[in-house]
C-alpha cells in the first residue's frame, strides 16, 4: 500500500473491515501480503484516512458479510478489495465475496499486486475472478524493470515482476477492466511504466 497521499493519523480501535473513501467502500480482509514494499504505509502507520486497518485477526466470510450489510451498499460507486494486505491470499473467500456482491448488482474492483498465480500455480486465477463477476482490477506495477521492482517491492516469490505483467495480460484478455498503477517516486520512470501499461492495453494511474 502506498504511503503517499494518505492521512496517517488513526485511532487505536480494533482494525476495521470496511471503510468509506472517495465515494467507494473499501474492504480490508487480510493483513497478509506477498511483498515488503519499501514505500508501504504499514511502515509508517496502522491505517489510512483515520481508520485502523491493523486487523487483530482475519475476519471470517460471515463477519465480512455482516459488516457489509451494515452499509447502504448501493450508495457507493465501487466496492473495492484492498486493505493492509494482498486480498488474493484469501482467494476462495475473495471469490465468494465478489459473487455475493455481484448478486446485489454492485460494481466490484480488486486492488492487487498481481502475484496470485504464484500463490496458486495450479489454478487459473484470472478466469476464476472473471467467473465470480469481477468488474475491474487495479494492479500495482511500481517499476519499469524487474531489477527495480525487486528492490522497491521486495517480493517473496521469484519472477514476481513477470508474473505480475502476465496477470495484467490475462485480465485484459479475459475482458476485465484493467488498470496498472505506480507510486510516483524518484527512482521510478513513470513514463516508461505508462508505455508498458499502454502496450499491454491497460489503463494507467500514478498513485
Predicted regions and their residues:
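Core AdoMet radical
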Residues: 45-59, 75-90, 105-121, 125, ...
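Auxiliary Fe-S-binding modules of radical SAM enzymes
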Residues: 2-15, 32, 62-66, 72-74, ...
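Alpha-helix-loop-beta-strand connector modules within alpha/beta enzyme cores
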Residues: 94-107, 163-175
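Short, charge-rich binding segments
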Residues: 18, 70-73, 99-104, 128-131
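Conserved strand-to-helix beginnings and helix N-cap segments that scaffold or border functional pockets
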Residues: 91-95, 122-123, 190-193
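Alpha-helical elements of the RecA-like P-loop NTPase motor core of helicases
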Residues: 38, 147, 191
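Canonical Radical SAM [4Fe-4S] cluster-binding loop centered on the CxxxCxxC motif
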Residues: 14-60
Amino acid at each position: 500500500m502506498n504511503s503517499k497521499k494518505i492521512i496517517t493519523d488513526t485511532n487505536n480501535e480494533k482494525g476495521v473491515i470496511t471503510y468509506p473513501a472517495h465515494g467507494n467502500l473499501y474492504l480490508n480482509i487480510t493483513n497478509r501480503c506477498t511483498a515488503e514494499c519499501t514505500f508501504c504505509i504499514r511502515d509508517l502507520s496502522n491505517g489510512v484516512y483515520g481508520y485502523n486497518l491493523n486487523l487483530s485477526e482475519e475476519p471470517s466470510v460471515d463477519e465480512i458479510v455482516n459488516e457489509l450489510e451494515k452499509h447502504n451498499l448501493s450508495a457507493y460507486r465501487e466496492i473495492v478489495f484492498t486493505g493492509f494486505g494482498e486480498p488474493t491470499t484469501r482467494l476462495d473467500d475473495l471469490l465468494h465475496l465478489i459473487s455475493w456482491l455481484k448478486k446485489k448488482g454492485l460494481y466490484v474492483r480488486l486492488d492487487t499486486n498481481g502475484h496470485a498465480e504464484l500463490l496458486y500455480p495450479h489454478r487459473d486465477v484470472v478466469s476464476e475472478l472473471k467467473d465470480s463477476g469481477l468488474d475491474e482490477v487495479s494492479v500495482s506495477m511500481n517499476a519499469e524493470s524487474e531489477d527495480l521492482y525487486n528492490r522497491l517491492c521486495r517480493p517473496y516469490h521469484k519472477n514476481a515482476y513477470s508474473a505480475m505483467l502476465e496477470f495484467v495480460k490475462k485480465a485484459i484478455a479475459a475482458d476485465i477492466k484493467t488498470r496498472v498503477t505506480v507510486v510516483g517516486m524518484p527512482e521510478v520512470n513513470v513514463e516508461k511504466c505508462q508505455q508498458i501499461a499502454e502496450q499491454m492495453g491497460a489503463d494507467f494511474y500514478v498513485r
